[in-house]
């Protein structure tokens, strides 16, 4: 049997972190076993679905490196791959259910259904449809239609049946049909519901494994009933755990960004995010945390997927991403940082090429401390601003030292005499100043650092002086002396 998995998002918003994790697990499982991964768009929610959302989801998947073998935009033998383009296909199978006695028209209004729901709740019972329209006569149906009622189609759930979901992550999970009640499979506008469409699509697209979030587990018995009624073979189900925040509540905006493109725009690398997403519920067969897509494809299995909730830990994501930043070549990293230099107004877009080597030196001096690339905007302002503001309390304390003025004058005079500021020449310069003034270590370097950057911490002072260059160093010292005096 060929392994065929799918990711079937509703285009009603952005690609959520949970959705991205589901897509990744499906992709990895298919690739691990030489199968096919399919992307299907479930746009049956006409009010909330949009082409814009679909584009955002597709862009996010492609950015992550999750490519599909069949589906929207790439085609395939079992299309179309949007639910709204498959309505005629669904209608055929609704007719089959009517013929077999598994479907009926329901004319209940929203108000009637809500009243029934409240009555069951008041009795401490689980809300479900009690089958009021199950056995309507043709006359009753006609009367309802004359009143202007538009019917839904409901699935007739057999009574007293135990439904077992054989789950590859959770083991066997049992449900009772009496707790489910007859459920809607076609809405009053003629569009099928998710629970019906997903069965038809998964069957016709020959999906072998349905890997999805735990929140879909309660839908599965309904889907199994439809599979059985139509005589379809069941796929294998695997329901992966929920993603919770560190406080063990459902992940939401208060736990940080929840959409993939928010992380992309902040400058998280796709390699870092993929690595982190894989660890939300799956554990590698060896003791390691940093790996690439190739490793994941070779090692992913559902046996190593936990049924316990996955905890979204932003500190762990930052650590993993920082390790992937360090794995990039300096050229690659610089190229990736250019949009943030432009965004901060440090350079114009058309200057990036001519200033590339200089920008590379800047990136080299700060990249080791980065968790994500947009942080670079705040780390590199010291290279672009000659009018240095001294606002840190720690920096102001340094300026109270008695020898600051004399030391800065000596430093300025030495810089003026230098032809080029290479790392070797700058190190030699500091040795000369130390010999001449007697100051060394913190007493030598800290006042110069504060005068040039306004800060007490940052990249190596030698790197700062080389990158800023003689002309700008002198401008900074002039500005500093005016401010200091």
UniProtKB/Swiss-Prot annotation:
It catalyses: tRNA(Glu) + L-glutamate + ATP = L-glutamyl-tRNA(Glu) + AMP + diphosphate. It is found in: Cytoplasm. PROSITE patterns: AA_TRNA_LIGASE_I. It comes from Caldicellulosiruptor saccharolyticus (strain ATCC 43494 / DSM 8903 / Tp8T 6331). InterPro entries: aa-tRNA-synth_I_cd-bd, aa-tRNA-synth_I_codon-bd_sub2, aa-tRNA-synth_I_CS, aa_tRNA-synth_I_cd-bd_sf, Glu-tRNA-ligase_bac/mito, Glu-tRNA-synth_I_codon-bd_sub1, Glu/Gln-tRNA-synth, Glu/Gln-tRNA-synth_Ib_cat-dom. HAMAP family: Glu_tRNA_synth_type1 (MF_00022). Keywords: Aminoacyl-tRNA synthetase, ATP-binding, Cytoplasm, Ligase, Nucleotide-binding, Protein biosynthesis. ATP binds at residue 253. This is Glutamate--tRNA ligase 1. Its EC number is 6.1.1.17. One of its GO terms (molecular function) is tRNA binding. Belongs to the class-I aminoacyl-tRNA synthetase family. Glutamate--tRNA ligase type 1 subfamily. Its main location: cytoplasm. GO terms for cellular component: cytosol. CDD domains: GluRS_core.
